[in-house]
Regions:
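Structured ligand/cofactor/substrate-binding pocket environments in proteins
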Residues: 141, 145, 196-199, 308, ...
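A well-structured
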Residues: 1-291, 297-302, 390-404
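Active-site-adjacent bridging/hinge elements
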Residues: 120-122, 224-230, 271-276, 334-347, ...
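Short flexible/disordered coil segments
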Residues: 136, 143, 276-291, 329-347, ...
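Inter-helical turn/loop segments and adjacent helix faces that build the functional surface
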Residues: 238-239, 262, 266, 307-310, ...
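Zinc-dependent metallohydrolase catalytic domains
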Residues: 323-333, 340-342, 368-405
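Active-site-adjacent "gating/activation" loops or surface patches in catalytic cores
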Residues: 165-180, 289, 293-370
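Short helix/strand-bridging catalytic loops that position acidic/His residues to coordinate divalent metals
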Residues: 228-235, 352, 378-381
Length: 405
């Protein structure tokens, strides 16, 4: 047996070869909805079968999203993603709600092992409380609209010293010891973004209105409160976040102000500009711990392998199975994410890597998240958690890509 071959989980309920069309999916949902359940054991089997269906859909959607973000300029990949978003998900949503209700209303629910199923039950009840039929077309539109951002930003590039760079690649010049080089890079990046200012502002306003309507339809005052519920944030509230923000303002901001003053003095500048914030104050050139994506992957595997041989082996297998895309290039979506693949039992890692130290931290963050996916691949009750965690990962990637420059 080749340890580098990652085998997908064997299906026991669905066909081993399954084309995602509504004609193929509809009978499966119908059988799950109509199946008679006469005991806790049968309820668990129903959950396993439903989880298998969820895993099939999640991984199919995952690969459509991954391929699209790897090449935002490929219209066929965009159409493939949009087919799922517009033709499959809107039909699946009400049936998922029906299956959620069947699960929660089962007389055998209380007989399940609560230590194993409590989180799944809690999340399913939350999904039932949030579901609104009128939100299905809105969420479909949101799915399609928000991908326009990646297409627009993925196409951005600048020319520095006669060579074309993606914005992430150009950001490496912000660490250059020559101030004019840094200034030119920062202004070039900013000016390129400003070209799309009106387009991106219009897109933001469109999405804001759609998301606010989704929240109001679900009886929330705003989208923030709706997403706290949708992401399953049961352990802290928006008020907790506000208190944390205030604590940062009182304790961290003054420290950062002192650091900025020290930086200004060390660089012997009358005032700090945005292009002065990343250069080494000692005058040393920027760290360049890897020359390309292949070396970044190899060094990361070696590092993690020394921490935990099993994790190193799994990352080596992920590399062999093409589960990394770490190079920055034109047409690649900005930001980074770790996308769990429900049937494969391993994630796809898509960091916004640059040939500098930040690239190492991006990949390290992603692989620490990947460790969770690797170790939880056999969890039969993990579907709801996978969905919420993936959504948080992708939204975090979008936020980071917007805030980086």
């Amino acid at each position: 047996m080749n340890d580098l071959v990652i085998k997908k989980k064997e299906r026991t309920y669905l066909k081993s070869v399954f084309e995602i069309t509504w004609e193929n999916l509809s009978p499966i949902f119908d059988e799950l909805a109509k199946r008679s359940i006469g005991s806790a054991t049968e309820l668990e089997q129903w959950l396993r079968d439903r989880s298998e269906l969820d895993a099939l859909l999640e991984e199919d959607f995952a690969w459509r999203y991954i391929r699209m973000t790897c090449n935002t300029a490929d219209e066929a990949l965009l159409n493939s993603f949009q087919y799922f978003a517009t033709e499959i998900e809107p039909k699946v949503a009400p049936l998922n709600d029906q299956l959620n209700r069947k699960f929660i209303e089962s007389p055998f629910l209380t007989e399940l092992d609560q230590s194993k199923y409590a989180i799944l039950i809690r999340g399913t009840k939350q999904a039932l409380a949030l579901f609104r039929e009128e939100n299905i077309p809105l969420q479909t539109t949101i799915q399609v609209e928000q991908q326009k951002y990646q297409g627009i930003t993925g196409a951005m590039s600048v020319t520095l010293n006669g060579q074309e760079y993606t914005l992430e690649q150009a950001a490496t010049f912000l660490k250059d010891t020559n101030r004019e080089t840094r200034k030119n890079a920062w202004q070039s990046i900013s000016n390129r973004r400003l070209v799309e200012k009106d387009t991106l502002n219009d897109l933001f306003n469109t999405l804001r209105a759609l998301r606010h309507q989704v929240a109001q339809n679900a009886n929330f005052d705003n989208f923030r409160d709706y997403m706290f519920a949708a992401l399953g944030r049961f352990d802290y509230t928006a008020e907790d976040c506000f208190q944390f923000h205030e604590a940062i303002e009182k304790t961290v901001v003054p420290v950062l102000a002192k650091h900025a003053d020290a930086r200004k003095k060390a660089l012997a500048l009358p005032s700090l500009q945005p292009w002065d914030m990343e250069v080494d104050t000692s005058g040393k050139p920027a760290l360049k711990p890897f020359k390309d994506g292949a070396e970044l992957i190899e060094k990361s595997i070696t590092c993690f392998g020394k921490l935990d041989p099993f994790l190193g082996e799994r990352l080596q297998a992920m590399k062999a199975n093409g589960l990394f895309d770490v190079e920055s290039r034109k047409g690649k979506a900005p930001g980074g994410y770790n996308y769990p693949l429900a049937e494969t039992g391993a994630p796809f890692i898509f960091p916004g890597s640059k040939e500098q130290y930040n690239g190492v931290t991006d990949v390290t963050d992603a692989r620490l998240l990947a460790r969770h996916a690797v170790w939880s691949e056999k969890d039969p009750a993990g579907t709801g958690r996978r969905r919420a965690e993936t959504l948080q990962s992708l939204q975090g990637a979008e936020r980071r890509s917007r805030c980086e420059f």
